[in-house]
């Protein structure tokens, strides 16, 4: 069994944990938390060993009646691979700790490509990550772009893509992130999404822009893709329908009528 440790059991980490438990060749040997937030209930219900991020956090957990199995370094030594789900731009700081322990690691979005050295999407460049000790999974927006554009690139060829990301502001619990009642543009052009897609689809010509809006629901992608050929709309829909993890929703209007 592959021993998996999850560093950061929050919005992403709890979903990763659920996926790992569905595998027949993996087991979760522990999760790391900085504080006993509401996500902890899922970890405790699943009987995951809990590790505090640092030693000085252990009494905090114990004051809530939570048994702590150690700290982050202890889990890193125990695991064969760490799934790093810590907040963006923080996870890369853990690389030296993972290397020192000889533990492989996967970063779940939020990090830049260059410090990690390899970016991964299961549909577009799976084989490129085979044998790597350290891999970065691209962000949710990059994943969405990749899963819809890659089939078009393979089947019809793409001359150019222009895309605008309408981004949700954060998760429901992140009330401090905003914007509250505004639309916040990303002033850098291209936004990071286009270059990020190119880390997993290197031959795609793409330019992106983004705005952030006050909702927690979802992201929206507005895409203009210039294909090398002109397929029928029905053929494009059939192609997407056959693509893993792409779902076509039909028959509902915004007002709820069919």
Task: State what each model feature region is.
Residues 3, 14-72, 157-160, 164-258:
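C-terminal substrate-binding/catalytic lobe of Rossmann-fold NAD(P)-dependent oxidoreductases
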Residues 9-10:
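Glycine-rich Rossmann-fold phosphate-binding loop(s) that bind the pyrophosphate
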Residues 75-77, 99:
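A short, aliphatic-rich alpha-helical micro-motif
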Residues 80-81, 104:
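Structural motif
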Residues 84, 131-140, 180-187:
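Flexible, glycine/proline-enriched loop segments at strand-loop-helix junctions
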Residues 128-153:
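Short alpha-helices
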């Amino acid at each position: 069994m592959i021993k998996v440790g999850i560093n950061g059991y929050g919005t992403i980490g709890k979903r990763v944990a659920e996926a790992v438990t569905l595998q027949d060749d993996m087991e979760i040997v522990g999760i790391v938390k900085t504080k006993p937030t509401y996500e902890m209930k899922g970890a405790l219900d699943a009987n995951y060993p809990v590790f505090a991020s640092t030693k000085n956090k252990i009494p905090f957990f114990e004051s809530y009646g939570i048994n702590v199995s150690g700290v982050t370094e202890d889990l890193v030594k125990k695991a064969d691979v760490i799934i790093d789900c810590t907040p963006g731009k923080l996870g890369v700081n853990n690389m030296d700790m993972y290397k020192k322990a000889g533990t492989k690691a996967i970063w779940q979005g939020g990090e830049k490509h260059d410090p990690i050295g390899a970016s991964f999407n299961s549909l577009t460049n799976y084989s490129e990550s085979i044998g790597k000790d350290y891999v970065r999974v691209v962000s949710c927006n990059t994943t969405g772009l990749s899963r819809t554009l890659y089939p078009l690139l393979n089947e019809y060829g793409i001359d150019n893509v222009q895309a605008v990301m309408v981004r949700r502001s954060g998760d429901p619990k992140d009330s401090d992130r905003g914007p509250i009642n505004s639309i916040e543009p990303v002033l850098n052009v291209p936004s990071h999404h286009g270059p990020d897609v190119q880390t997993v689809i290197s031959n795609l010509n793409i330019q992106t822009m983004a705005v952030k809006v006050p909702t927690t629901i979802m992201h929206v992608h507005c895409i203009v893709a210039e294909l090398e050929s002109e397929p029928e709309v029905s053929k494009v829909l059939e192609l997407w329908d056959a693509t893993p993890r792409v779902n076509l929703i039909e028959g509902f209007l915004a007002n709820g009528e069919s």
